[in-house]
C-alpha cells in the first residue's frame, strides 16, 4: 500500500535496510535472507577468503510484541521451531534457532516505558501489541474504525457492505450499524456492542479487512 511505501522510504532515508514482507510467506523470508547477504557481502567474502565460509551468520529478531517475530523465524527456518501465538508476551526469554546458514535469536517483544504520542499508543493497541485485558474493547474498536476508514474507506465498506452514508456515521453509530448487519443483537433488538467490538478487532487483526498499514 501507499502507507507501506512511505515507511520503506522513511527507513531507507535513515540509511537502514528495509524489506516489506509477510512473516507467514516463504518468499518474504527469502527476501530477508537476500538482504542480509547483500548487506554483509564484504564480511562473507572475507570469511570465505580465510577459510571460514561455513561459519553461520547470527541474526537477532527484535521489535514490539505480537508483530510476528517468532512466526517469521519459523518461516525462515522452514519448520515450527519457535513458539508463536496471536497475542503479546508468548516469547518469555531469548531462544536460539539454528538453520543451515544462520543462527537466529528470537527475543521477547519490547515497548516504550511511556508513549508520548496517542497515535503510536492507538496503533499498538490496534495490532495487539498491548494486552487487550487492560483496554476498553468498545473504545478500541471505535477508534480503529475511525482510523481505518480515513485511509482505507473502501476496505471497510466492502467488508461490512456499507453505503457512503453509513460509513460516514459517528464511530459508535457506525459500530452499531455493523453489529446490526451481522445480527449481533440482544433481547429487544439492541446491538451487543461488546460482541461487535470484539468481532471488529479480531477481523482486523486476522487481515479480513484487507492489507492495511497504519
Give, region by region, the residue ranges found by the protein language model.
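Solvent-exposed alpha-helices and their adjacent loops that cap or buttress functional pockets
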Residues: 52-54, 76, 97
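Helix-rich effector regions associated with P-loop NTPase G domains
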Residues: 16-17, 85-214
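Canonical P-loop GTPase G-domain recognition
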Residues: 1-63, 182-185
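Glycine-rich phosphate-binding P-loop
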Residues: 58-78, 82, 107
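Short, solvent-exposed amphipathic alpha-helical segments in soluble enzyme
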Residues: 8-9, 77, 121
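Conserved protein kinase catalytic core
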Residues: 1, 28, 80, 112-115
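Alpha-helical scaffold segments in soluble metabolic enzymes
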Residues: 31, 35, 71, 143, ...
Amino acid at each position: 500500500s501507499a502507507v507501506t511505501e512511505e515507511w520503506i522510504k522513511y527507513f531507507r532515508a535513515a540509511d537502514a535496510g528495509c524489506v516489506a514482507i509477510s512473516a507467514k510467506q516463504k518468499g518474504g523470508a527469502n527476501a530477508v535472507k537476500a538482504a542480509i547477504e547483500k548487506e554483509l557481502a564484504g564480511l562473507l567474502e572475507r570469511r570465505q577468503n580465510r577459510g571460514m565460509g561455513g561459519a553461520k551468520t547470527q541474526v537477532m529478531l527484535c521489535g514490539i510484541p505480537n508483530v510476528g517475530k517468532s512466526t517469521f523465524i519459523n518461516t525462515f527456518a522452514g519448520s515450527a521451531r519457535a513458539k508463536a501465538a496471536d497475542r503479546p508476551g508468548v516469547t518469555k526469554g531469548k531462544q536460539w534457532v539454528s538453520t543451515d546458514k544462520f543462527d537466529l535469536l528470537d527475543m521477547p517483544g519490547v515497548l516504550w516505558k511511556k508513549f508520548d504520542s496517542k497515535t503510536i499508543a492507538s496503533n499498538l493497541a490496534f495490532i495487539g501489541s498491548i494486552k487487550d485485558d487492560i483496554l476498553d474493547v468498545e473504545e478500541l474498536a471505535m477508534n480503529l474504525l475511525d482510523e481505518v476508514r480515513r485511509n482505507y474507506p473502501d476496505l471497510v465498506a466492502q467488508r461490512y457492505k456499507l453505503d457512503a452514508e453509513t460509513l460516514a456515521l459517528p464511530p459508535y453509530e457506525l459500530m452499531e450499524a455493523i453489529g446490526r448487519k451481522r445480527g449481533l443483537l440482544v433481547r429487544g433488538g439492541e446491538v451487543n456492542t461488546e460482541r461487535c467490538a470484539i468481532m471488529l478487532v479480531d477481523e482486523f487483526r486476522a487481515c479480513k479487512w484487507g492489507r492495511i498499514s497504519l
